[in-house]
């Protein structure tokens, strides 16, 4: 990697073994008595684009100017390397070294020193001296003007690229909270030492008596002593030498370039002169004359990244002063203090050097890493600072103290500080706009909103809000005694109202809601009513206690007000002896009158406050009451609707029970005994299904005529045991129309509301029993009537048949004529059965069985009648048959006639 320097200037081997270190150019060791860079800080070759313009002073030094070695130098275990010289004259030796220093035209500014190089960048001249190929002055090479112009153009282009890179959007600082160690161990090896940076270096020569392995302090080979921010590179200690004006001009140019690259904060123009004076003071500074300003064993190398290289274990007690000083200057609202000595050399009062609370280097500019919160004035934004970092930010403390300050004073201080900074640095406007992060803008906006909210709160605190919740939250007035306050606060927790503004807003019944709320549905109205009713019921339990508490608080407030006014009046009257002058007497009387007016106004204020509170409560409850009234109206409307439907159903049931053929239409189930009159057996009973109810309800609507109904609605009313409807017989239409028992309208069927099964169950038990008894009695009467008619028909037939032997032709004609009435009578019988028992007719198989039985009975009766008539005539006195030819030739009598001869 680098060259190991093993005591080439007469240092003992023991000390040299501990002080072996790598030479990587000018940044290897910036200060005599400090450690060099780690191996991570590699010596990479630098192209001309990354270098400084020629002519810039460089602190690289060749070992040619070293004095003769001195013997007897003791070594300490620390890796500090101090080259020996004349211990009696350290100042003269330093001046000699400065005079013999070789200036390099280039300065390393590239980031490539962070990478490790495998090749050495040093060489040895013919005289045996080590030459830094990067930083030391090399033999002049003849370059043409054209090449020089090209080099300058490349340098300018590199500058533009570097500026664009450094000012890119979203660029963060090079420093982060984790970069700077909180405590640096003194036993770190050179390879593990903290990384040094390019700028903000603070060099303090260490007195020879402070290091154990000490000689006179002298610069190391390839390690120029850089001043603060690389802006105070000294070319010669003597002001008479010609290099000083050139060095100052080069420093100005170097500063301008660093400002453009964002590595250095720009300074105001008036500070330039003081900076030059500070540079001279730093060059002529003798650490032996000011031993108290240099901490023991400490030679910090601070930089923009917040990193440092230390030789001593811990800082002295003087170093902890800087954190307090920074905090104090932050409170005063001025930028960080820059005395002439601190600006350039960083050496001044005892508190000018040191570290912050966490052991971080706190130079005048590098120390500004301890940021102040956004509400406090800050120095101009620096490229090397991060607004969102900083482990020792005193933000909460500053914010707490700042919140206690008056608002006007805070705004005045903030405006004055900002204006003063801009006046001191007029050239920073564009620079700050480019660098200001987004977070700063957000914090500024939040601060403005906070100020606005405070102003609004101050304006709104004229009178407290007249509500129970607000009184409970804000507590009792301050003039009450602590015991009374404690008692009231304890008792107040138990009597809080439940119907608060939060509940009203949640239920969307608060009057102060913006805009007109959409109307609530019936379900929402019901939910709101339930919650409000519960809240009202809960409030009713604590109403008396809340009234007593409010009255007691009101009385206490009035009494306290009266006491204060009386005390004020007493204090004025006690000072009546002081009012000697006539004008004073008038003022005295005026004050007494004002006190009386205040007394009356206080009483009126109390009464008006009660009225205002009552009106506000009425306003709060108005929407809630409106919602509850709406719910009651909905209930009333629903009740009227259900009641009307129920009455219609009862009326329809009564009408159906009064009909002779009501069971075919009303759908009311009949009992088993009413159905057993004709068939002799029980039919299965079924409840009327819900699907039947709409057709049933549509049969009896107001305004309908009894004969305006159509019969297709009837099949749904009759159900068979298997659930299949039977079509009505066409012959049933005239009978139904004659009796006028159907009065449904198909047009009204769709519009009629469908009654649910619950409406059927709402019928009283008495109505059901009465309807069943009426149906049973009517069925019984009709059954008896039909049975009687059948018996009459049979008797008539028998009478006619008995007369047939005397009048054979008439009997034959009457038999032919009776065929038609018999068929019609059968049809009437089937129709009667269908009307009486609709469920029986729904099954076609039962109908055919009944028809077959009737037909067989008719045939049997006919055969029986004809047989009897012929047998009686054969037994007559003439001894011969008098049957007619039709009877003899008929198919039922032919068999009998064949059987008679065989029997005779």
From Swiss-Prot:
It is a single-pass membrane protein. The keyword ATP-binding does not apply. The modification Phosphoserine is found at residues 110, 386, 676, 689. Residues 144-176 are annotated as: Interaction with PRKG1. Expressed in the colon, rectum, and cultured colonic smooth muscle. Detected in various cancer cell lines. GO terms for biological process: cGMP-mediated signaling; relaxation of vascular associated smooth muscle. The keyword Protein biosynthesis does not apply. Residues 175-184 have a biased composition (Polar residues). It is found in: Cytoplasm, Perinuclear region; Sarcoplasmic reticulum; Membrane. One of its GO terms (cellular component) is perinuclear region of cytoplasm. Residues 103-114 have a biased composition (Basic residues). InterPro entries: MRVI1. Residues 248-258, 270-285 have a biased composition (Basic and acidic residues). Residues 30-114, 166-399, 699-730, 791-824 are annotated as: Disordered. Residues 540-638 form a coiled coil. Pfam families: MRVI1. The chain crosses the membrane at residues 844-864. Keywords: Coiled coil, Cytoplasm, Membrane, Phosphoprotein, Sarcoplasmic reticulum, Transmembrane, Transmembrane helix. Its main location: cytoplasm. Plays a role as NO/PRKG1-dependent regulator of IP3-induced calcium release; its phosphorylation by PRKG1 inhibits bradykinin and IP3-induced calcium release from intracellular stores. Recruits PRKG1 to the endoplasmic reticulum and may mediate the assembly of PRKG1 and ITPR1 in a macrocomplex. Involved in PRKG1 signaling cascade leading to inhibition of platelet activation and aggregation. Also mediates NO-dependent inhibition of calcium signaling in gastrointestinal smooth muscle contributing to NO-dependent relaxation. Part of cGMP kinase signaling complex at least composed of ACTA2/alpha-actin, CNN1/calponin H1, PLN/phospholamban, PRKG1 and ITPR1. Interacts with PRKG1/cGKI-beta and ITPR1/IP3R type I. Interacts with HCN4; regulates HCN4 channel activity. This is Inositol 1,4,5-triphosphate receptor associated 1.
């Amino acid at each position: 990697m680098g060259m190991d320097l093993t005591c080439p200037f007469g240092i003992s081997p023991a000390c040299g073994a501990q002080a072996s270190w790598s030479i990587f150019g000018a940044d290897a060791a910036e200060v005599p008595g400090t450690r060099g860079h780690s191996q991570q800080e590699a010596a990479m070759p630098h192209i001309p684009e990354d270098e400084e313009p020629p002519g810039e002073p460089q602190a690289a030094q060749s070992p040619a100017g070293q004095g003769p070695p001195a013997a007897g130098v003791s070594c300490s275990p620390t890796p500090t390397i101090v080259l020996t010289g004349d211990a009696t004259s350290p100042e003269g030796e330093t001046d000699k070294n400065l005079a013999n220093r070789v200036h390099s035209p280039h300065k390393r500014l590239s980031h490539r020193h962070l990478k490790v190089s495998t090749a050495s960048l040093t060489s040895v001249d013919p005289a045996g001296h080590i030459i830094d190929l990067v930083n030391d002055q090399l033999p002049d090479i003849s370059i043409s003007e054209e090449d020089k112009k090209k080099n300058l153009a490349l340098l300018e282009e590199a500058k533009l690229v570097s500026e664009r890179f450094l000012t890119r959007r979203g660029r963060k600082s090079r420093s982060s909270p984790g970069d700077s160690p909180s405590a640096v161990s003194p036993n770190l090896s050179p390879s593990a030492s903290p990384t040094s940076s390019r700028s903000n270096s603070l060099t303090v020569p260490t007195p020879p008596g402070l290091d154990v392995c000490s000689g006179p302090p002298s610069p190391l080979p390839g390690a120029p002593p850089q001043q603060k921010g690389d802006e105070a590179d000294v070319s010669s200690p003597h002001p008479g030498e010609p290099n000083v004006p050139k060095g100052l001009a080069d420093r100005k140019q170097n500063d301008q370039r660093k400002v453009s690259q964002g590595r250095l904060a720009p300074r105001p123009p008036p500070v330039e002169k003081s900076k030059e004076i500070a540079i001279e003071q730093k060059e002529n500074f003798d650490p032996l004359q000011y031993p108290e300003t240099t901490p023991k064993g400490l030679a910090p190398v601070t930089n923009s990244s917040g990193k440092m290289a230390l030789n001593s274990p811990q800082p002295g007690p003087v170093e902890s002063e800087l954190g307090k000083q920074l905090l104090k200057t932050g409170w005063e609202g001025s930028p960080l203090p820059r005395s002439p000595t601190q600006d350039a050399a960083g050496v001044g009062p005892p508190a000018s050097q040191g570290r912050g609370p966490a052991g971080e280097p706190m130079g005048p500019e590098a120390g500004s890493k301890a940021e102040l919160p956004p509400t406090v004035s800050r120095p101009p934004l620096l490229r090397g600072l991060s607004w969102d970092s900083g482990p020792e930010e005193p933000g909460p403390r500053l914010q707490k103290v700042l919140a206690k300050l008056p608002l006007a004073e805070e705004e005045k201080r903030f405006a004055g500080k900002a204006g003063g900074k801009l006046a001191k640095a007029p050239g920073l406007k564009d620079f700050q706009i480019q660098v200001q992060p987004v977070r700063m803008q957000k914090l500024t906006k939040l601060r403005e909103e906070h100020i606005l909210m405070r102003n609004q709160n101050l304006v709104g605190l004229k009178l407290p809000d007249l509500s129970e919740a607000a009184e409970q939250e804000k507590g009792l007035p301050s003039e009450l005694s602590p015991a009374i306050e404690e008692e009231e606060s304890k008792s107040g927790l138990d009597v809080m109202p439940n119907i608060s503004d939060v509940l009203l807003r949640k239920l969307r019944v608060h009057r102060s809601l913006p805009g007109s709320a959409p109307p609530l549905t019936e379900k929402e109205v019901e939910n709101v009513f339930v919650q409000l009713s519960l809240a009202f019921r809960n409030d009713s339990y604590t109403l008396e206690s809340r009234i007593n508490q409010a009255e007691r608080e009101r009385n206490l407030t009035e009494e306290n007000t009266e006491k204060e006014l009386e005390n004020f009046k007493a204090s004025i009257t006690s000072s009546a002896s002081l009012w000697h002058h006539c004008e004073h007497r008038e003022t005295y009387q005026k004050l007494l009158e004002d006190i009386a007016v205040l007394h009356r106004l206080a009483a009126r204020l109390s009464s008006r406050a009660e009225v205002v509170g009552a009106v506000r409560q009425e306003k709060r409850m108005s929407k809630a009451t409106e919602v509850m009234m709406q719910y009651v109206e909905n209930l009333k409307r629903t009740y009227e609707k259900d009641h009307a439907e129920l009455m219609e159903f009862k009326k329809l049931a009564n009408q159906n029970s009064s009909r002779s053929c009501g069971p075919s239409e009303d759908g009311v189930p009949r009992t088993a005994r009413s159905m057993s009159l004709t068939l002799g057996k029980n039919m299965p009973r079924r409840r009327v299904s819900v699907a039947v109810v709409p057709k049933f309800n549509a049969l009896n609507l107001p305004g309908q005529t009894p004969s305006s109904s159509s019969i297709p609605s009837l099949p749904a009313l009759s159900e068979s045991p298997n659930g299949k409807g039977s079509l009505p017989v066409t012959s049933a239409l005239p009978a139904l129309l004659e009796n006028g028992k159907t009065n449904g309208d198909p047009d009204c069927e769709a519009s009629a509301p469908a009654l649910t099964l619950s409406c059927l169950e709402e019928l009283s038990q008495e109505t059901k029993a009465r309807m069943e008894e009426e149906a049973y009695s009517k069925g019984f009467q009709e059954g008896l009537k039909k049975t009687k008619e059948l018996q009459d028909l049979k008797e008539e037939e028998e009478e006619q048949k008995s007369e047939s032997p005397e009048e054979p032709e008439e009997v034959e004609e009457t038999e032919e004529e009776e065929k038609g009435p018999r068929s019609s009578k059968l049809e009437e019988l089937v129709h009667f059965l269908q009307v009486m028992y609709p469920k029986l007719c729904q099954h076609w198989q039962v109908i055919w069985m009944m028809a077959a039985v009737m037909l067989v009975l008719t045939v049997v009766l006919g055969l029986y009648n004809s047989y009897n008539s012929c047998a009686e005539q054969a037994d007559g006195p003439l001894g011969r048959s008098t049957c007619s030819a039709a009877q003899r030739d008929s198919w039922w009598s032919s068999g009998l006639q064949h059987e008679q001869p065989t029997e005779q």
